[in-house]
A protein has these predicted regions:
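Internal maturation/activation junctions in enzymes
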Residues: 11-108, 120-121, 128
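Active-site rim segments in enzyme catalytic domains, especially the processed small/beta chain
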Residues: 100-165
Length: 167
């Protein structure tokens, strides 16, 4: 998803280095909408599904997606797969002055997770499984021996062995 976003954004010129420039934030948000649409439609366990990685990361595809974006308005609609209603989660990323970084997700997903608490431990059970795809024809369908893509996948970007950015 990050690479799809970066490929789309690579075709834009940004004035200066201000990370909070309104146009920059707008285009980053729109690129994210397109990349997450592609994630939900295509990204799956490549050992079990044909994931069109070369297409999704190609310059031609990025140019097609870039053509959908406008500086003066957001896309009215991003067509994509129909997913179950989503909820929120908590994500934490920290980088210290020494360059050490963490990328951490801890979630019960919906408010109070499943609403089920263990009698023995008092632990609240999560319901993150509601985000898995159960349609057997979908490339990311959950199944035996598969590693389906899920939203709880914190990442770390490195260059030349050095941490650049957690996400």
């Amino acid at each position: 998803v990050a690479l799809i976003m970066l490929n789309i954004l690579a075709g834009f010129e940004f004035d200066g280095d201000d990370p909070l420039d309104v146009r920059r934030l707008h285009l980053e948000s729109e690129a994210a909408r397109l990349a997450y649409r592609d994630r939900d439609a295509h990204i799956a366990d490549p050992a079990k599904s044909a994931v069109p990685t070369e297409t999704l990361l190609s310059e031609a595809y990025a140019a097609e997606q870039r053509a959908l974006l406008r500086d003066d308005r957001a896309m009215a609609n991003v067509p994509g797969p129909s997913l179950a209603p989503s909820s929120d989660t908590i994500y934490l990323t920290v980088v210290d002055t020494g360059g050490n970084a963490i990328s951490f997700i801890n979630s019960v997903f919906s408010l109070f997770g499943t609403g089920i608490v263990s009698d023995n431990t008092g632990v609240l059970f999560h319901n993150r499984g509601s985000s898995f795809v159960t349609d057997p024809d979908h490339p990311n369908a959950i199944g035996p021996g598969k590693r389906p893509m899920h939203t709880i996948m914190p990442g770390m970007l490195a260059k030349d062995g050095e941490i650049v950015m957690p996400f």
